[in-house]
């Protein structure tokens, strides 16, 4: 789902994207190198994470605990939002596992969203700002 959504987002030409995927790094790098998408094979550092306005977790639920632990102690910008499309993982999962995350949103896209024709359900925590809600609405 993550790759398909990225394809749809690239067609919007509104944002630039970086992808972190240690498991599929080579294939993604080959696929997206012409689209100016930066592909990384390791978790960003604390200083690198501060450059992101939106962090989207689009991973399989069975690896969620392992992946999220790598972000556990990061300090995020106050206006950054962490979005998740991980099946079955509620906002509380992120609140418990990423202690410095402030703005959180759970997104449930449907398949037509992959071609910018669908609807997505968003639920954010109480800190999820209207400004970030507009950004998330645009990409989902």
Language model regions located:
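NAD(P)+-binding Rossmann beta1-loop-alpha1 motif at the extreme N-terminus of oxidoreductases
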Residues: 1-50, 117-118
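Short amphipathic alpha-helical segments
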Residues: 6-7, 30-32, 68-71, 94-97, ...
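Hydrophobic alpha-helical segments typical of transmembrane helices
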Residues: 5, 24, 63, 90-93, ...
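Residues at the starts of beta-strands that form the adenosine-phosphate
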Residues: 15-17, 81, 103
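Rossmann-fold NAD(P) dinucleotide-binding segment
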Residues: 40-99
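Internal alpha-helical scaffold of NAD(P)-dependent oxidoreductase catalytic cores
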Residues: 48, 93-103, 119-140
């Amino acid at each position: 789902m993550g790759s398909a959504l990225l394809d749809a987002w690239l067609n919007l030409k509104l944002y630039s994207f970086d992808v972190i995927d240690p498991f599929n790094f080579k294939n993604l790098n080959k696929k997206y190198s012409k689209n100016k998408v930066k592909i990384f094979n390791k978790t960003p550092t604390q200083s690198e994470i501060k450059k992101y306005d939106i962090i989207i977790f689009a991973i399989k639920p069975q690896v969620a605990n392992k992946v999220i632990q790598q972000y556990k102690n990061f300090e995020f910008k106050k206006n950054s939002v962490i979005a998740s499309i991980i099946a079955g993982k509620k906002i509380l999962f992120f609140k418990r596992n990423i202690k410095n995350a402030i703005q959180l949103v759970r997104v449930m896209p449907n398949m037509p969203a992959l071609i910018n024709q669908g609807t997505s359900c968003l639920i954010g925590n109480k800190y999820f700002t209207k400004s970030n809600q507009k950004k998330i609405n645009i990409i989902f």
